[in-house]
Amino acid sequence: MLLSKKISNFVKHKGIKPNSAIMKKVILTLSVMSATLSAQAQLQTNNGIEYLQCQARDMSGDFSDLANTYFLADSITGFDFNKGEGLLNWKRYRLAPRQAFNLNGYWPVRMKMLDFPDTQYDNDPNLKIRIQKIDDRTLRVTLFTSPVEPKMDEANDPMFSPEFIAESLGNGDARLARGRWNTSADNSRIIYQNRNGVLEIQKYPFRLILKDANGKILTQTRHIIDNDSTQVKLLPFNFIKRGSDNSRSINPVFLLSPGERIYGCGESFTSLNKVGQKVNLSVVDPQGPETDGMYKPVPFYFSNRGYGIFMHTSAPATADFGASYIGAQRLFMGDETMDFFVFFGEPKQILNEYTNVTGKSPMLPLWTFGTWMSRISYFSQKEGLEIAHQLRANRIPADVIHFDTGWFGVDWQCDYQFAKDRFKDPVGMLKTLKKDGFHTCLWQLPYFTPKNRYFKELVAEGMAVRNGNGTLNYEDAVLDLSNPKTVTWYQDKIAHLIKQGVSAIKCDFGEAAPYDGLYASGKTGFYEHNLYPLRYNKALWEAVKANSPEQEGVIWARSAWAGSQRYPLHWGGDAATNEVGSVGMMGDLRGGLSFGLSGFSFWSHDMGGFVTQSPDDLYRRWLPFGFLSSHTRAHGAPPTEPWLISKDFTDAFRANAEMKYQLMPYVYAQAKDCSEKGLPMVRALFVEFPHDAGAWLVEDEYMYGSQILVAPLLESGTDRSVYLPKGKWIDYQNGKVYEGGYQHISVAEHKIPCVILVRDGSLIPQVPVAQSTDKIQWNQISWKPFKADASQCVGYLYKPGDKEITIIKQ
């Protein structure tokens, strides 16, 4: 029934005079009710998505909601260089429906506020913009959407590295000394400039313009006037105030240039180049590396045009890189503040700068680079010792035995105690394994089922995440790792295991922190969900390191967020084992490359896949990829152990393991270099060859460190096409020389079924094969030159106990 008819019937029924004061109140009341109902209906349509539990949030929908108010960045109204602060004027808009030739759409149109009392609010607010000099390649740009700045406890921000906090936040003089930027201004612009780049702030129309040192525009923000020349009325740089609750979220919009390519965003399993994709930066359990979900999203990316951006936030965000409009990067952020770190340079320089802010991966103990043997799961002391015995009996070099979900009294029931009936003497077992060169890793998770022995304690002591009613969000108790009391409790449990002789702890899960939970930090899951893996990684890493002999322990984690690279290492999750298409293997390769382009030096994956028994051919092709990754693990549904498959497969497995152990001096030196510079061990070709246009197109090959190129066989067969950057490349296995460009290479006669090529002019260190890394004979290093046109060969050496890398020339 129409509102007018409802009012008419109501008036007649009550006998109210048409122009009376009562009549005016009735009309006002019913109008408010109508508007409220309309808003609710609109919210249900545009903003009322019912997400599955812990499903990735797509924040873009909030920026097309007709119930919201839109504020468009318009002009700078003042700026103080001494403070690095100014005021940015935002114009108030709404989205207005428009019909043209039977096509319905909506355009942003100017709006006069209806807020009351109207003298107390600004129709077009002036809000703070702040620029900070961080380093000579890094600037920090912060825009606020409220006159009240949100509390930013940066000294305790888990995303920032301790070094960044100490040097850049704690000591302003040190920061300014590093961040040498020349500043200037005129009537139309504000400029920060040095030899590496330019940030130009155009006053009106407001734009943030990034330029290279020569003045070439790299990207810039969009203004409403950019819509004048197009029928597509794209929302420019804006923030919203929601009609539902007045909460705010910001939407920076940047130019996306022809030929531009975007990389990063975490361990993404889709195409490396994110242009054309819509990336949801929300931690999820994607159930494997075959979808667009991510265990390890990272709100950082960079462009082939020479700039990078770190969105300093833990709120969910959606990055639309030309998916909805081919000329724009649309960053739909859940946060109400835009806090961006902007980097200038080539990929290596940008990765170094980004990891200066969020931290670099520390150098890891030598034993971690050896073979990790596992399955889901070994259930007893006897079984673990037998696996170790078989590895040595079959002469397969290995350093780690991992016990997955089955070491507790009840499978999957994490209580931090070895099952007494199946592990008669766990400490003795750990000592026996260590004596034979094996370190031990144990599985655990941060969720506690109602039947877990610790469930009631966690709930009673307030150590689990709670909902608004004070009860649990789920049936399980999820550790609230923003609570120092919980962290202490958790670390005590881990410390007991490390003191017994365990060397590594598997940091499984961590993706299901409730979005609607209330946390001890005082924040909701909107800000804590993505932070959860980082807090989880940190708590476990600290417990393992603090209680390990010589602080040599590590973690083995599945989930991550920006800053988690400080707590290595991570693996690629539960890969599919389907042979046709090798989808799991392809997803892992893309994920590892993308992860490395997001600031993580070390990474692994389950060779052969995880879900079911790996087909023989798939497992064989996966082996070289696994052993030529920074870290190597066989894990998944049994059998993963080669001797349980066949003698021929055992020989193949051994050959791959021996190759890596021979290369361990190379691996160790490259790892050290990566840890110092924020570089990945498994790196996309363009990181090493940024001026080779073809290198930017390749996503099924990688550089293993700086000198070895690896192209796995992603399909059945013995040959494949590869792209080689300019120069000569020498086959690691037979010495054949290849020219740069596209080549079709056969490995039919190779012992290792993989294309492995060495860069011309490389000097590769090798050692005799050892059965474990503690038996490596570092005094017997030989140097193998790979030389075609090069006049000199260069190699790198870093031995355990060394302080720095030594450059060797021959």
What are these regions (language model features)?
Residues 1-44:
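Bacterial Sec-dependent N-terminal signal peptides
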Residues 41-357, 362, 366-367, 376, ...:
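N-terminal accessory segment at the very beginning of proteins
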Residues 160-172, 220, 229, 397-653, ...:
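Aromatic- and carboxylate-enriched substrate-binding clefts and catalytic-loop regions
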Residues 542-547, 552-553, 560-572, 590-591, ...:
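Catalytic core of carbohydrate-active enzymes
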Residues 138-139, 189, 198, 207, ...:
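Beta-sheet entry/capping signal
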Residues 380-393, 487-496:
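Short, acidic/polar
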Residues 300, 391, 433, 540, ...:
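Conserved, mostly hydrophobic/aromatic
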Residues 136, 144-146, 195-197, 204-206, ...:
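An acidic- and aromatic-residue-enriched active-site/binding cleft used to recognize and process polar
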